[in-house]
């Protein structure tokens, strides 16, 4: 059914609900309806009996008044009446062949026990249920008589059948008419969906300039807002990728141009740095820069892949990793002093190789901007391990603080890089956080790692 039009699906659902409710009501109220029709049968018998005994009482006892007779004094032909003498011995049983003598005998026995003037009864006669009312205390031509009024069960069945036909007709009409609200509801629901479909198709073709307009707050509205959110993120991602591509091209082009320029100079017998050795040193330095940038780009791609995978973290010593990185990098500026405050060995869950890269990127920044010293402290409490790294270099511009983690963000010294972007992604993989703040004497990096 899911391949059918929405209007048809809604109509089928509405019709199914209506039909199920109708069947359920018929099942639940079948006994109630049976009792109702039984009572209705007795009421009809009593009404007809009242009309007959009060206004048109026949003058002949033991005469049956058949409902089929055109001259019958009753108004409802399904009800039949018989005048009987109150004393069974006075009954001649004439003209009653259609009623069994055993039934007439039973009627007299019931009448003998009957204290009320009128009472309801039922019995099986010739395999068919009969509802009857006995009314005593009548007088016909000076003779005591009683009126036996009865109706067959088929009368009750006729009432039930008539009501059932009416219910079926009403249900059929309602189900057919439900097609109208189904079509209206389908159009009401599908109109925004069709619009969303067109927008999504255009977005799939990278035509995402036009916003998705949503003027409702229900589930369809939420879907529209989600599509608009997706469109905005795709636009932002597209712009980021273009900017990233431009920055990568610019960042890689500089060392390549230096290497090519110096290489061509050597071929021409010119040594820009005075001699061959110094000139080759420049080429080697630029090649190392180029290699590092390429490695960082590859590492950033690797982190993007790991972000989508479930990675198992092991316990390792963050103190040992930090000391190893410091030992490797501190020779870049021998004049800097290092102050390390670590109370004890600290174990934490994570990937040692990623933390090595993280600390390397942070400390390279510290070394680049520090004036005289770098301070490192590590502490832990019940919930977090806090790593604080501080340098006494110049403050970071306020407008730069919010964009430090963006790839190829241009630093104060005019350098592009992705070091802090790598730091941020590694911390995200470890559910850790970082804050970079200016203080009175320099810049402080504070990392909080949950245990």
Curated annotation (Swiss-Prot):
All residue ranges annotated as the HAMP domain in the record: 187-239
Membrane topology: Multi-pass membrane protein
EC number(s) recorded for this UniProt protein: 2.7.13.3
Swiss-Prot/TrEMBL catalytic activity: ATP + protein L-histidine = ADP + protein N-phospho-L-histidine
Positions where Phosphohistidine occurs in the chain: 250
Extracellular-side segments: 31-165
Enzyme class: transferase
Domain called Histidine kinase: residue spans: 247-451
Matching SMART domains: HAMP (SM00304), HATPase_c (SM00387), HisKA (SM00388)
Pfam families with a match to the protein in the record: HAMP, HATPase_c, HisKA
Annotated transmembrane regions: 10-30, 166-186
Domain of life: Bacteria
Key word Cell inner membrane present: no
Cytoplasmic side: 1-9, 187-451
Annotated disulfide bonds: none
Keywords: ATP-binding, Cell membrane, Kinase, Membrane, Nucleotide-binding, Phosphoprotein, Transferase, Transmembrane, Transmembrane helix, Two-component regulatory system
Functional summary from the UniProt entry: Member of the two-component regulatory system CssS/CssR required to control the cellular response to secretion stress. Required for the transcription of htrA. Could detect misfolded proteins at the membrane-cell wall interface and then activate CssR by phosphorylation.
Full protein name: Sensor histidine kinase CssS
């Amino acid at each position: 059914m899911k391949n059918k039009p929405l209007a048809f699906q809604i109509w089928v659902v509405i019709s199914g609900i209506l039909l199920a409710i109708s069947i359920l009501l018929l099942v639940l109220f079948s006994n109630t309806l049976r009792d109702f029709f039984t009572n209705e049968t007795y009421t009809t018998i009593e009404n007809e009996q009242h009309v007959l005994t009060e206004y048109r009482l026949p003058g002949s006892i033991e005469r049956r008044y058949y409902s089929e007779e055109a001259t019958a004094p009753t108004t409802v032909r399904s009800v039949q009446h018989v005048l009987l003498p109150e004393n069974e011995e006075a009954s001649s049983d004439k003209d009653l062949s259609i009623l069994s003598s055993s039934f007439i005998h039973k009627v007299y026995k019931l009448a003998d026990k009957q204290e009320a003037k009128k009472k309801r009864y039922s019995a099986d006669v010739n395999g068919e249920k009969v509802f009857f009312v006995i009314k005593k205390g009548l007088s016909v031509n000076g003779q005591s008589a009683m009126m036996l009024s009865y109706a067959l069960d088929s009368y009750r069945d006729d009432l039930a059948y008539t009501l059932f036909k009416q219910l079926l007709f009403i249900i059929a009409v309602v189900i057919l008419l439900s097609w109208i609200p189904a079509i209206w509801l389908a159009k009401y629901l599908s109109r925004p969906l069709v619009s969303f479909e067109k927008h999504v198709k255009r977005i799939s073709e990278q035509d995402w300039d036009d916003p998705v307009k949503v003027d409702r707050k229900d589930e369809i509205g939420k879907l529209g807002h989600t599509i608009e959110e997706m469109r905005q993120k795709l636009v932002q991602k597209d712009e980021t990728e273009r900017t990233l591509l431009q920055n990568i091209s610019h960042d890689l082009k500089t060392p390549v141009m230096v290497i090519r320029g110096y290489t061509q100079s050597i071929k021409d017998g010119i040594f820009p740095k005075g001699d061959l050795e110094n000139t080759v040193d420049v080429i080697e330095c630029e090649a190392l820069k180029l290699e590092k940038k390429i490695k960082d780009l590859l590492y950033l791609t690797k982190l993007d892949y790991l972000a989508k995978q479930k990675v198992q973290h092991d316990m390792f010593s963050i103190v040992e990793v930090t000391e190893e990185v410091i030992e490797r990098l501190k020779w870049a500026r021998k004049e800097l002093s290092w102050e390390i405050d670590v109370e004890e060995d600290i174990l934490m869950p994570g990937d040692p190789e990623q933390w090595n890269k993280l600390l390397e990127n942070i400390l390279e920044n510290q070394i680049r901007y520090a004036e005289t010293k770098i301070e490192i402290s590590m502490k832990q409490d019940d919930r977090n391990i806090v790593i604080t790294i501080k340098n006494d270099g110049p403050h970071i511009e306020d407008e730069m603080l919010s964009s430090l983690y963006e790839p190829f963000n241009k630093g104060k010294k005019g350098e592009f890089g992705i070091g802090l972007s790598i730091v941020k992604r590694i911390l995200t993989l470890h559910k850790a956080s970082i804050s970079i703040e200016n203080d009175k004497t320099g810049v402080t990096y504070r990392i909080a790692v949950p245990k």
